[in-house]
Amino acid sequence: MGVASQSSVANEAGAAPEASIQQTLRGFSSPTSLLLRIATAVLCTLTLAFLVTSKERKEIASIDIVAIWSNSKALIFLAVVSGICLGYSLLHAAVFLVMLSGNRNPLARKKALDWMVFLADQIFCWFSIRVSNAGFV
């Protein structure tokens, strides 16, 4: 009975957990990721455009009342988070395009950078969920 190598143990167990993690992290630098970043940037831009331009005018007892988005702290929080997410999405898309246009392959990035992207995505997801709940508090 000899000593089994790590690759043979990984092959017997199916797939090594490290390989699965690497495949997941490589998804953050795929062309689909670029399209999702652009879609996120478009949606954040639309959110900011609707917030800035929306006004509601109502006349109550011959008094003209104008409601604007800056009167609500939840909507201000939504505008700030949308602006930050817009900047992050554009930055990530620009980094991907620079890596794609240069000699570097965007799929051959460092694992630490992929973990940073994953962490930042999780933080922005948490902020987005928090924004959606801010209006109900």
Curated annotation (Swiss-Prot):
Keywords: Cell membrane, Membrane, Transmembrane, Transmembrane helix. The keyword Disulfide bond does not apply. It holds the Pfam family CASP_dom. Residues 1-31, 97-116 are cytoplasmic. It is found in: Cell membrane. One of its GO terms (cellular component) is plasma membrane. The chain crosses the membrane at residues 32-52, 76-96, 117-137. It is a multi-pass membrane protein. The keyword Cell membrane applies. Residues 53-75 are extracellular. Homodimer and heterodimers. Belongs to the Casparian strip membrane proteins (CASP) family. This is CASP-like protein SELMODRAFT_431320. It comes from Selaginella moellendorffii (Spikemoss).
